[in-house]
């Protein structure tokens, strides 16, 4: 893994030790994942989990080096300078194995904003890389009350469609925060595995229909 914030980086390493994972069994690097990735020699990966910072600034736009970076070039555009969200998604997709799965926590604006971000969503949908969008409850993560989403990526899907799950009501209130219980998690996972329509909760949408909706990936659409 890789983390740019030194405090979070050190906490991550401490967490490994607390779970009895020896130093030689993990490789967590300190640095900028987008402009200075540290694991070129290790990719591709069969499992990727990421909770990147929401809508941070980066070089982006028309940077001549990044636009030719093999992680970002397939979409034909770069994520905007003011919003790096989809750059993290393209990075994860690039380093994902053909038989792998990636899950990235996303700021909701990623799902509907226009411009370059719409073009990147179009690339992801037209190439059938998005497996599922899961709408999470608000007030779930530390530091933000915004209702985030999870985008699940796969490169070897059997059908040309995308599953949408509205899990915004799947939580219990704990003091001032919301929390997913094991029962909530099981409900979401069962819908994810079954890939069937469930009224007011899950819907499997053909990618052609998503294209007709201007590549808007909002679960409430």
Give the predicted meaning of each segment.
Residues 4-42:
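S-adenosyl-L-methionine
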Residues 42-221:
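A conserved structural/catalytic subdomain of Rossmann-like adenosyl-cofactor enzymes
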Residues 1:
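Conserved SAM-binding loop
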């Amino acid at each position: 893994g890789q983390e740019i914030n030194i405090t979070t980086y050190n906490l991550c390493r401490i967490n490994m030790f607390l779970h009895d994972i020896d130093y030689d069994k993990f490789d967590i690097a300190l640095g900028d994942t987008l402009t200075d990735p540290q694991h070129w020699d290790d990719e591709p990966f069969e499992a990727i989990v990421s909770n990147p910072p929401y809508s941070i600034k980066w070089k982006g736009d028309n940077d001549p080096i990044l636009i030719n970076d093999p992680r970002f070039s397939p979409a034909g555009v770069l994520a905007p300078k003011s919003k790096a969200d989809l750059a993290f998604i393209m990075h994860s997709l690039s380093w994902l194995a053909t038989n792998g799965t990636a899950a990235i926590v996303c700021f909701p604006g990623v799902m509907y904003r226009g411009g370059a971000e719409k073009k990147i969503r179009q690339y992801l949908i037209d190439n059938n890389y998005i497996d599922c969008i899961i709408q999470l409850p608000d007030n779930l993560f530390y530091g933000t009350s915004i209702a985030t989403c999870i985008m699940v990526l796969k490169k070897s899907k059997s059908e040309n469609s995308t599953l949408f799950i509205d899990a915004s009501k799947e939580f219990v209130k704990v003091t001032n925060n919301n929390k997913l219980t094991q029962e909530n998690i099981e409900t979401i996972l069962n819908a994810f595995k079954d890939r069937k329509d469930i009224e007011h909760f899950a819907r499997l949408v053909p990618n052609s229909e998503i294209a007709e909706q201007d590549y808007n990936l909002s679960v409430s659409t």
